[in-house]
A protein has these predicted regions:
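Residue-level recognition of single "structural anchor" positions
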Residues: 1-273
Length: 273
């Protein structure tokens, strides 16, 4: 959706409400009946049990004092900004407080993070880790002192990136993460970190590359693609002045979501309502 199309489509609160009503499955929140009085979308009434509720109930817009036009503008900006938007910018553009701007973007990230990634059933995948410190991303060293561990699975042919924050890079954690997202039929490429030693017990096609010997083995094993993917993740975190440790997983999921595909306005809205 282009900017002029967006501006024409969502000029008023009523236009925004109508758009949500068109996307959302409208049923009673108590008895799940579909027979509703929808003359007032902010106060719909079930014709079976008389329950009244808003079309916004259950969405990120519920009980928000911020106008829907502002919310829609933020979502449009969020979609069209590859590496995220600082809350300071949103606060200035919408004329809201920094706290309100952060809360709005946090709600979007939280909903996006709940989307289940696509399970990889076949093909070649690369698995690697990235360590986030207070100074940014640093690949060297696996010490978790003042760092957060992010593990990723990447399949180049489908451009499918899956990320997760783990407590540490021990074998049982890495193996469980891989088993949850890829089939045992996949050809798995990793580096020679000892945490991947048990992968052969599950993935019969597991190959490693020792980075002390080079970036690509003699038979072509490498993790170059996923290591280059970390640049995208790095830029996302650098967009923001500071990211709390307990929110790192949300920003990482946001970055992966945008990396996998350019989401449409409708696709994102369906996640948020």
């Amino acid at each position: 959706m282009k900017l002029n199309e967006f501006n024409n489509a969502f000029q008023t609160e009523q236009q925004c409400l109508a758009y949500i009503a068109n996307l959302k499955e409208n049923k009673c929140i108590r008895c799940f009946n579909f027979n509703l009085n929808t003359s007032d979308l902010k106060r719909m009434r079930c014709l079976k049990c008389n329950q009244t509720f808003s079309i916004l109930t259950g969405t990120i817009f519920s009980r928000s004092q911020t106008s829907l036009t502002s919310w829609f503008y933020l979502i449009f900006r969020w979609i069209n900004t590859k590496h995220g938007i600082p809350s300071t910018d949103i606060a200035k553009e919408l004329g809201v407080t920094l706290k309100t701007a952060w809360r709005m973007t946090h709600k979007i990230r939280t909903r996006i993070a709940k989307q289940k990634p696509q399970f990889i059933v076949e093909g070649t995948v690369q698995i690697d880790e990235m360590y986030l410190s207070h100074m940014g991303f640093k690949k060297q060293g696996r010490s978790l002192v003042n760092k957060t561990l992010i593990v990723g699975i990447y399949q180049k042919t489908t451009n499918n990136l899956i990320v997760k924050v783990l407590k540490n890079a021990k074998s049982k954690n890495l193996l469980q993460f891989a088993k949850n997202h890829i089939s045992s039929k996949c050809l798995v490429y990793t580096d020679s970190w000892k945490g991947y030693c048990d992968f052969k017990s599950v993935f019969t096609k597991h190959e490693t590359i020792n980075h002390q010997d080079g970036y690509v083995s003699k038979i072509g094993v490498n993790t170059n693609q996923i290591e280059s993917v970390w640049k995208h993740i790095r830029r996302t975190f650098k967009t923001h002045i500071k990211v709390a440790k307990n929110h790192v997983h949300l920003y990482a999921k946001e970055a992966a979501y945008k990396f996998n595909k350019i989401p449409s306005f409708e696709t994102v809205m369906l996640c948020l309502i």
